[in-house]
Amino acid sequence: MDDTSQRDNIYAAPHDNVGEFIFDKKVVDVFPDMIKRSVPGYSTIIHMIGQMAERYAKADSTCYDLGCSLGAATLAMRHRISAAGVSIVGVDNSSDMIERAKQVIDADSYDVPVTLRCEDINQTPISNASVVVLNFTLQFIPKQQRQSLLANIYAGMNQGGILILSEKLTFEDAHHDELVTDLHHYFKKTNGYSELEIAQKRTAIENVLVPETLTTHKNRLTEVGFRSVDLWFQCFNFASIVAFK
């Protein structure tokens, strides 16, 4: 956790009405703790995003972190990119997230230029991109908008550029889906979340975060035009794909 982060207890007490999950200041204040205790493998994914950016960011190009939240992937890229003339654009539609992310970026001493924008990533112009990151972001975009978003990203990428897509997955095999869901819930329990917290968070987020199968993601990326689509990380029902233009 960073110095401004608190422990996530948003759903620790019973809620008479569990509303939809939103990325407001209440979530921003506990977000690093929430992610660490809720998403298995998150720190590994962030570290490897930095490493892949170091490998594939080209001189005088732009890297995008779409749905950047507090800038974890942005910082991972910033700390590893060595190519000259590279800049990073971080985008999030939560003003609370962007406000806090600016504080995080301003406190960082690395010199790769970073621009943060508060806007809908469906409206973000993509150009001259060598690396684009969607780190647990697409799952919050309405299904009917996902194809057009990826098509817009693809169109703005340079040949040889990469898209890193991390997502929570669902599985066609009911037994496997039940198994990994149970293992994920146990992961959260071992990290200190109560059954009440897990149940209320699930209620809040079930119509906000809409997961899809790995096959669906791969097919969509191929349909958009990516020439190579590969799974590079998976832990339970959390995975990350790298797609090459």
Swiss-Prot record:
Is Oxidoreductase tagged as a keyword? no
Q: Name one GO molecular function term.
A: carboxyl- or carbamoyltransferase activity
Catalytic reactions on record: prephenate + S-adenosyl-L-methionine = carboxy-S-adenosyl-L-methionine + 3-phenylpyruvate + H2O
Reported EC number(s) for this entry are 2.1.3.-
What is the enzyme's class at the highest EC level? transferase
**Keywords in UniProt for this one?**
S-adenosyl-L-methionine, Transferase
Please list the GO biological process terms of this entry: tRNA wobble uridine modification
An example of a Pfam family matching this protein is Methyltransf_25
The annotated subunit structure for this chain is:
Homodimer.
Q: Which family does it belong to?
A: Belongs to the class I-like SAM-binding methyltransferase superfamily. Cx-SAM synthase family.
Under NCBIfam families, the record lists: carboxy-S-adenosyl-L-methionine synthase CmoA (TIGR00740), PRK15451.1 (NF011995)
Q: What is the role of the protein in this entry?
A: Catalyzes the conversion of S-adenosyl-L-methionine (SAM) to carboxy-S-adenosyl-L-methionine (Cx-SAM).
The identity of this protein, by name, is Carboxy-S-adenosyl-L-methionine synthase
Q: Which organism is it from?
A: Saccharophagus degradans (strain 2-40 / ATCC 43961 / DSM 17024)
